[in-house]
């Protein structure tokens, strides 16, 4: 074998993202993805005197909580030490936590929980995270609880024990990533709107006692930069925010006026996910995460519902649960079988033992004892549910006007002044907003972003409570398809025909931007045929990669299963002709002709394809990310940009690749590994590249058994391309 490695500074960003590691990340992709490989995290704050004075001010402040104005940011240098080398990154740090248990004196030296934002590099793909004093999260309970939730399918952050040193003071801390884009992708979700409970009114707001204004606290957006990316993301965020605000308003009205402990249901009781999440937290003694100000939310455009993001449950896994009143006598806890499964327990133990520094024997003891108590708590919860009479008369959903009136009454009682926006309407590139008092103004997208993320406008506290949530789904159809066991959501102009006998699904566009989303379907032995309209026959208005419903594909398949499936697509004006998300199985054939942009885009999936053919694509012919992909035969022609693009920690193997005409043949990026037995590429400027492009990943690898190509090979310092003898 011969190695062709060319350092080519074609992108300053790509070559410097991990320039401060004394090893090539591609050589240790599996190791740097394992928490146990991290031996120590060292943080040095150059302005140590100011940093220590900040600690002293927090310690001696007269408030019970940590004053927000003392959570100042400090520049820092962060070093991650492994057995095989170390990385040094620029970072910013600040005090973390609400209460003063996040600061302690250890042998006279200051130890504090801190928020860290890396300006370069990453730790286990995270660029924003917390280093927490273990006692603030009940130590091992937080690590194990986060793992169990993630294994059950909930969104939960990467969490592990790690040895640290901050300005020379050593301690064991809990590493926990923040709720961000990287967290979503780790949990197989595409970037989208993120929200949390609004805390501004809780902590020393205008000298009100802590928590005295909790009945006025609703929610806020935590990723306004995503909102500002374009009109589609603005549309999605505002629609979701209106729905969440109404749910939070309902909660405050019921909880604080009627005295009933109700969960927050942002999906309007149409889904059991928040009920199941609450029950799971109860049996794990993690109900602290259900406090409104600890709640975090993700809006999933594919399921068209909110999902909870775990945060700060204060788990006590080995204690009997304090169980609330059951939801109803018909409720069945959904995770009973899995929590009793020995295979599930073994998977959890393996993950746990690599994330703690107490040794395997103590780890096994802790896991076994925790599961024994959780199982008993589940039993008690189910027995309590079985014995309850269905609730009647206790809870009646109040109307939005009633909830709003009572909210305004409480606002007057507390003498809290807030501007209240009641409607938002897009006018060209700005927004026409109306207040409850009827006053109208024009706000820019940046001003709207500040309202929904900070509840502020021009220095004044301002909240958005939509009196009428606009029905923005009037141009969609939803259909349950019994033959494949799932649902289809699609544009009204699109034609959908299902032939159960021939196992064919035929889809035809009226407008070239029409689209369809299949959710949770089983396509065993089925053929999907998508007949698209010509690109010039389109009323397409969106300017981002996705439309106002978050779809990038003409044909979208979400959480679906394949076996001997065939997919044929022709034309259409979507960013992806075919988009497969979070799906599994084997596909016999995919054929795409005249793709407007990407031909085939697959994300967060584990899929094998026997034959894939793309003939003409306005961008990439094949683009995969965040998954495991195996293909026998790939035939690509006339790819405007890349023939094959593999990114975001993917593994792709292929037997044969035939490509004619592309700017770049194969691109392996961002901790991905490509292995192609035989490739023949003609009409390309660059045969292959292996690079790191995103901060949250490392280098990439591409291995060719044989590569017949006359173009360039591009490799950055963290990556490698290996070619067989020709």
Give the predicted meaning of each segment.
Residues 238, 285-286, 298-420, 427:
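C-terminal catalytic region of ATP-dependent kinase domains
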């Amino acid at each position: 074998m011969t190695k062709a490695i060319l350092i080519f500074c074609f992108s300053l960003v790509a070559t410097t993202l991990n320039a401060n590691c004394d090893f090539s990340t591609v050589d240790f992709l599996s190791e740097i993805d394992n928490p146990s490989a991290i031996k120590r995290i060292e943080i040095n704050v150059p302005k140590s005197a100011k940093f220590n004075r900040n600690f002293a001010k927090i310690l001696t402040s007269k408030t019970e909580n940590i004053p927000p104005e003392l959570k100042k940011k400090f520049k820092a240098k962060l070093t991650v030490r492994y057995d095989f080398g170390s990385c040094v990154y620029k970072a910013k740090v600040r005090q973390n936590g609400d209460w003063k248990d996040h600061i302690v004196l250890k042998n006279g030296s200051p130890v504090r929980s801190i928020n860290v934002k890396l300006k370069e590099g990453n730790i286990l793909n995270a660029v924003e995270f917390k280093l927490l004093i273990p006692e603030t999260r009940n130590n091992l309970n937080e690590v194990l609880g986060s793992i169990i939730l993630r294994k059950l399918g909930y969104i939960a952050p990467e969490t592990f024990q790690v040895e640290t040193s901050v300005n020379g003071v050593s301690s064991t801390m809990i590493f926990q990533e923040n709720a961000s884009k990287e967290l979503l992708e780790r949990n197989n979700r595409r970037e989208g709107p993120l929200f949390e409970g609004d805390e501004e009114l809780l902590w020393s707001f205008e000298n009100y006692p802590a928590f005295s204004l909790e009945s006025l606290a609703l929610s806020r957006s935590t990723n306004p930069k995503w909102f500002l990316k374009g009109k589609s993301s603005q549309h999605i965020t505002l629609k979701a925010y209106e729905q969440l605000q109404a749910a939070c308003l309902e909660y405050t009205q019921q909880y604080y006026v009627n005295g009933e402990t109700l969960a927050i249901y942002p999906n309007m009781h149409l889904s059991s996910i928040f009920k199941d999440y609450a029950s799971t937290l109860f049996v794990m003694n993690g109900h602290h995460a259900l406090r409104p100000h600890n709640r975090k939310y993700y809006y999933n455009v594919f399921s068209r519902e909110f999902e909870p993001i775990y945060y700060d449950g204060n788990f006590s896994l080995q204690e009997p649960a304090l169980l609330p009143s059951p939801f109803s006598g018909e409720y069945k806890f959904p995770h009973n079988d899995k929590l009793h499964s020995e295979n599930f327990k073994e998977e959890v133990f393996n993950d746990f033992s690599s994330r703690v520094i107490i040794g395997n024997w103590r780890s096994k003891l802790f896991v076994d004892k925790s599961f024994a108590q959780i199982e008993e708590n589940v039993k008690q919860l189910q027995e309590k549910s079985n014995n309850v009479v269905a609730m009647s008369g206790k809870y009646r959903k109040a109307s939005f006007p009633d909830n709003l009136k009572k909210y305004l009454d409480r606002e007057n009682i507390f003498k809290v002044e807030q501007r209240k926006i009641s409607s938002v309407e897009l006018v060209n590139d700005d927004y026409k907003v109306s207040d409850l008092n009827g006053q109208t103004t024009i706000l820019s997208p940046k001003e709207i972003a500040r309202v929904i993320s900070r509840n502020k406008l021009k220095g004044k506290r301002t909240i958005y409570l939509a009196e009428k949530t606009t029905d923005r789904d009037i141009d969609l159809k939803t259909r349950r398809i019994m033959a494949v066991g799932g649902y289809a959501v699609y544009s009204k102009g699109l034609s959908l025909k299902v032939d159960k006998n021939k196992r064919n699904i035929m889809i035809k566009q009226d407008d070239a931007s029409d689209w369809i989303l299949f959710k949770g379907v089983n396509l065993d032995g089925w053929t999907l045929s998508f007949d698209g309209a010509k690109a010039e026959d389109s009323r397409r208005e969106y300017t981002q990669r996705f439309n106002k419903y978050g779809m990038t594909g003409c044909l979208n398949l979400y959480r679906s299963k394949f076996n001997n499936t065939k997919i044929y697509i022709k034309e259409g004006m979507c960013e992806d002709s075919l988009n497969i998300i979070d799906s599994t199985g084997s596909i016999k054939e995919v054929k795409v002709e005249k793709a407007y942009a990407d031909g085939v885009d697959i994300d967060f999936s584990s899929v094998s394809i026997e034959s894939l053919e793309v003939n003409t694509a306005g961008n990439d012919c094949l683009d995969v990310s965040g998954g495991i992909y195996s293909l026998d035969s790939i035939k690509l022609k006339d790819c405007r940009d890349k023939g094959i693009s593999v990114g975001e920690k993917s593994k792709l193997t292929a037997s044969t690749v035939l490509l004619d005409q592309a700017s770049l043949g194969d691109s392996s990026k961002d901790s991905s590994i490509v292995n192609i037995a035989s490739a023949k590429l003609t009409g390309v400027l660059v045969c292959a590249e292996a690079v790191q492009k995103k901060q949250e990943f490392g280098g990439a690898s591409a291995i060719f058994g044989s590569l017949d190509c006359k173009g360039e090979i591009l490799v950055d310092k963290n990556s490698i391309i290996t070619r067989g003898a020709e």
